[in-house]
Amino acid sequence: MELVLKGQNFLEAGNFEDALGYFEQALLLNQNDPELWNFKAVSLRSLGRYEEALECFNKSLEIDPRDKHAS
């Protein structure tokens, strides 16, 4: 998915606000992908928005309890 790739590129470059925007757009299209919730959580955590990040990690675990990235 192009939105996810752009988000990952921004995340890797340290541009967390832009990364977050792309992951939020991707989630509008697919809210059942635990990886997207993890990417959003990492972006939020990097921005110091820890409570929101925790909510996203928890959402990822709700979708896939075996998700090693969110646990």
Predicted regions and their residues:
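Register position in tetratricopeptide repeats
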Residues: 12-13, 46
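Conserved structural position within tetratricopeptide repeats
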Residues: 25-28, 58-62
